[in-house]
């Protein structure tokens, strides 16, 4: 799976604050829209990352779109959530 430049895949090896820092770094690099992707058990962690971002940045971040679905990996269906975040100036 290739990761896009503005896509952050939430993984179990990193904690929530590390993912929040990754999003803030992307915003500071000039990227206006970031996609958070959480799969399986990391769906709740992706939502926690958004809530922590909202607490830190307040009205500086906006939730544009939420998409849920499932994908097939190794003949198993894995649920996912995509959170599209936009930097508001």
From Swiss-Prot:
Residues reported to bind Zn(2+): 14, 18, 22
Compartment(s) where it occurs, according to its Swiss-Prot or TrEMBL record: Cytoplasm; Chromosome
Post-translational events: Acetylated. Acetylation at Lys-12 decreases DNA-binding affinity.
Residues bearing PTM N6-acetyllysine: 12
GO CC, one annotated term: cytoplasm
GO MF entries: double-stranded DNA binding; RNA binding
Gene Ontology terms: biological process: chromosome condensation
Keywords tagged on the record: Acetylation, Chromosome, Cytoplasm, DNA condensation, DNA-binding, RNA-binding, Zinc
Function, in words: Binds single-stranded DNA, RNA and double-stranded DNA. Involved in DNA compaction.
Subunit structure, interactors included: Forms homodimers and homotetramers. Homodimer at pH below 6.0. Forms homotetramers and higher order homooligomers at near the growth temperature of 80 degrees Celsius and pH 7.0. Interacts with Alba 1; heterodimers lack cooperative DNA-binding behavior and result in more compact chromatin structures compared to Alba 1 homodimers.
Family: Belongs to the histone-like Alba family.
Name of this protein: DNA/RNA-binding protein Alba 2
Taxonomic placement: Archaea, Thermoproteota, Thermoprotei, Sulfolobales, Sulfolobaceae
This protein's encoding gene: albA2
């Amino acid at each position: 799976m290739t990761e896009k430049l503005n896509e952050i895949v939430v993984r179990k090896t990193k904690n929530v604050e590390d993912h929040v820092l990754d999003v803030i770094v992307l915003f500071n690099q000039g990227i206006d829209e970031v996609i958070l992707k959480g799969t399986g058990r990391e769906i709740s962690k992706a939502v926690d990352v958004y809530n922590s971002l909202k607490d830190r940045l307040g009205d500086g971040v906006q939730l544009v779109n939420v998409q849920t679905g499932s994908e097939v990996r190794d003949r198993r269906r894995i649920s996912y959530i995509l959170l599209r975040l936009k930097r508001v100036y």
